[in-house]
C-alpha cells in the first residue's frame, strides 16, 4: 500500500512539474510571436495617399532606411501641387502593383533626378507606372523618369512623359550602372539632351 502511495505522490509531483514548465514556456512563445509580428510590420510600408509617399521620401533621406523593407503602392496617386521632389535613395523592394503615379514634376535645380534619385544595388522596383516630367534646371545631368541612377532592378515599369537634361538622360533611367538591370520597361513620350541620351537609359 505504501508503494502505491509513493508512486501516486511521484506521479502527482511529475505532473505538477510539467504544469509549471508549460506555464513558464507559453508566455515566451507569445512574446516571440508578438516580436515576429512587430518585425514584419516594421519591414513593410504601405502607400495609399500622397502624404504616405511624402513620408516615404522623407524617410529615404537616410540611405539605410529602406534596406530589407518592402513598400507597397496600394492606390493610384496624383502629385500635382504636392511638392514631391523624388525619393532620395532606395534600397528595398517597391511593389507598384500596377498602379499609376501621375503629375510628377521634377523641375528644380540639380543632377541625378528621377522619381527615385538613386536605386541602390540589390533594390527592386516592379510594376510601376509614372506620368509626368523630369526636367531639372542647372547642371541637368543624369536624368530619368523612373530613376536618375540605377544599380538595382527595374522590372515592368513604364514612364509616360518628358525627360530632359544636358547629358545622360533616359526615359527610364539616366544612368544604368554595371549592377543595374532594366527589364520589360517602356517609355512613351520624349527624351531631350545634348549628350548620352536614350529611350530607356542615357548610358
Describe the function of each predicted region.
Residues 2-15:
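Bacterial N-terminal signal peptides that target proteins for export
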Amino acid at each position: 500500500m505504501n508503494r502505491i502511495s509513493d508512486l501516486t505522490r511521484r506521479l502527482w509531483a511529475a505532473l505538477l512539474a510539467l504544469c509549471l514548465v508549460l506555464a513558464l514556456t507559453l508566455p515566451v512563445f507569445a512574446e516571440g510571436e508578438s516580436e515576429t509580428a512587430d518585425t514584419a510590420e516594421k519591414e513593410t510600408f504601405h502607400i495609399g495617399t500622397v502624404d504616405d509617399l511624402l513620408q516615404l521620401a522623407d524617410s529615404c533621406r537616410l540611405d539605410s532606411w529602406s534596406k530589407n523593407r518592402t513598400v507597397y503602392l496600394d492606390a493610384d496617386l496624383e502629385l500635382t501641387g504636392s511638392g514631391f521632389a523624388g525619393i532620395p535613395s532606395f534600397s528595398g523592394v517597391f511593389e507598384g502593383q500596377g498602379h499609376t503615379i501621375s503629375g510628377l514634376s521634377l523641375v528644380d535645380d540639380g543632377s541625378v533626378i528621377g522619381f527615385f534619385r538613386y536605386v541602390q544595388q540589390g533594390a527592386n522596383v516592379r510594376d510601376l507606372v509614372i506620368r509626368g516630367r523630369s526636367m531639372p534646371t542647372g547642371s541637368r545631368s543624369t536624368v530619368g523618369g523612373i530613376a536618375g541612377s540605377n544599380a538595382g532592378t527595374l522590372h515592368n515599369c513604364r514612364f509616360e512623359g518628358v525627360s530632359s537634361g544636358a547629358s545622360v538622360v533616359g526615359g527610364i533611367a539616366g544612368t544604368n550602372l554595371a549592377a543595374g538591370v532594366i527589364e520589360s520597361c517602356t517609355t512613351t513620350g520624349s527624351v531631350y539632351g545634348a549628350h548620352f541620351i536614350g529611350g530607356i537609359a542615357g548610358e
